[in-house]
């Protein structure tokens, strides 16, 4: 049998995502979609005559980024009660486009935490079956909320009252193939008739969802704005806290002790200009003003307590945001709340892979794992802003973005020849 060709990336630096320091003069070898070797040049296997060597001098190789809090069908500004401007079929098309944008901008895994009409399931299946090229997708289906709770104006939200209804809703999503369950446990920024820290689910309702999900080996993500509801979520076994706009030191310590993950979505509380550009209503901007400083202080509490931080934006992964994409800006913001650049990279790779349950497959550059790789000019482990200098994206060994001599991308979605990150600013 003919031996498959191996591609060797040589001469650059390598940050493997584990938190270890960069390897200088590194080699990354990729064969049949998997990493064959990742490490120092001295220990690398010898290339065969038929193999390809790619010089990445001046670049740093890293794992593909994760976005653990995405709504690929996001449409702004929010409209009146349960207005569906897409419809389920077109919603899936729009969601795929957003997934493709995420991929070419370095996000190789997307965790969807509340989408309508089965769009996340559709994109996930199409990518897994090889029908379409896209990032790895984890799907939660719609957010499951209390009657009248956070997100009730969303056409696909699933409103429940009582433990039995919440239990049934969680089981229905598992039946569809959900990778996780998302609940709306507290109020938030997007809805007008609620406080950010209002608790909206009763303990028995939370417990019912957690029991169903954990019984099926799945995690529960919870929208959480305030300190009291966060404590209840941690006590009742919720796996990841999403947002945490208001969280004190004691609650952060409780999270750390329980091993609860934190997906801060710092982009949201920095989104004044973004929301104004989208014509968001005054009540959202007023709530945002309340949350801004408190949010960063809350996440600092989490960092100091040793809570595991993961990367997610709430905005589209590829949304243009403060001179880059939302995902990369989120990683930059981590360094403003106490993480070092190396720790911020770990949060967006290894930590996030662990939360998503795919660490055995991806999230770090290690032999045997999927070749989900990005290359950037500079040293992002020292200057996190160098993540903006994206030169290559590889997903499962396929080049989806290639701005290096001698390389050609295998992926060129329609309309992406120029602008690679239109995000919600494109009116679909």
Please give the residue ranges for each predicted region.
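Active-site microenvironment of metallo-dependent hydrolases
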Residues: 1-26, 31-32, 36, 41, ...
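His/Asp/Glu-enriched, well-ordered alpha-helical/loop segment
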Residues: 215, 219, 293-379
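Metal-associated gating/positioning segment near the N- to mid-region
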Residues: 59-129, 147-150, 204, 236
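Active-site gating loops and adjacent loop-to-helix segments of metal-dependent hydrolytic enzymes
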Residues: 72-91, 100-103, 133, 141, ...
């Amino acid at each position: 049998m003919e031996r498959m060709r191996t591609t060797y990336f040589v001469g650059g630096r390598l940050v493997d995502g584990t938190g270890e320091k960069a390897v200088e003069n590194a080699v990354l070898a990729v064969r049949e979609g998997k990493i064959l070797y990742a490490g120092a040049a001295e220990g690398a296997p010898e290339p065969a005559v038929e193999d390809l060597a790619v010089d990445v001098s001046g670049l740093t190789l890293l794992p593909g980024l994760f976005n653990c809090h995405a709504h690929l069908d996001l449409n702004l500004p929010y409209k009146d009660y349960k207005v569906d401007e897409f419809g389920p079929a077109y919603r899936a098309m729009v969601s795929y486009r957003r997934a493709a944008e995420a991929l070419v901008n370095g996000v190789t895994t997307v965790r969807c935490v509340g989408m309508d009409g089965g769009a996340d399931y559709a994109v996930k299946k199409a990518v897994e079956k090889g029908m379409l090229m896209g990032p790895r997708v984890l799907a939660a289906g719609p957010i499951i909320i209390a009657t009248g709770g956070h997100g009730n104006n969303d056409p696909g939200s699933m409103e429940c009252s009582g433990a039995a209804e919440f239990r049934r809703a969680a089981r229905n999503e598992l039946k569809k193939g959900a990778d996780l369950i998302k609940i709306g446990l507290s109020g938030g920024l997007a809805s007008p008739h609620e406080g950010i820290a209002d608790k909206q689910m009763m303990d028995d309702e939370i417990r019912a969802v957690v029991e169903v999900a954990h019984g099926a080996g799945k995690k529960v993500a919870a929208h959480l704005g305030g300190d009291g509801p966060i404590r209840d979520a941690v006590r009742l076994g919720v796996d990841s806290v999403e947002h945490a706009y208001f969280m004190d030191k004691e609650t952060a310590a409780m999270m750390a002790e329980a091993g609860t993950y934190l997906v801060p979505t710092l982009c949201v509380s920095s989104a004044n200009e973004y929301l104004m550009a989208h014509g968001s209503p005054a009540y959202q901007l007023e709530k945002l003003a309340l949350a801004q400083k408190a949010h960063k202080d809350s996440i600092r509490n989490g960092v100091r307590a040793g809570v595991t931080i993961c990367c997610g934006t709430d905005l589209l992964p590829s949304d243009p945001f403060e001179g880059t994409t939302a995902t990369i800006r989120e990683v930059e913001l981590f360094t403003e709340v106490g993480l070092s650049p190396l720790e911020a990279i770990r949060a967006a790779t290894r930590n996030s892979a662990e939360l998503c349950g795919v660490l055995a497959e991806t999230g770090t550059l290690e032999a045997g794992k999927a070749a989900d790789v990005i290359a950037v000019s500079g040293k992002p482990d020292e200057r996190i802003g160098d993540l903006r200098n994206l030169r290559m994206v590889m997903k499962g060994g396929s080049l989806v973005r290639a701005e290096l001599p001698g390389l050609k991308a295998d992926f060129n979605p329609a309309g992406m020849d120029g602008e690679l990150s239109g995000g919600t600013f494109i009116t679909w």
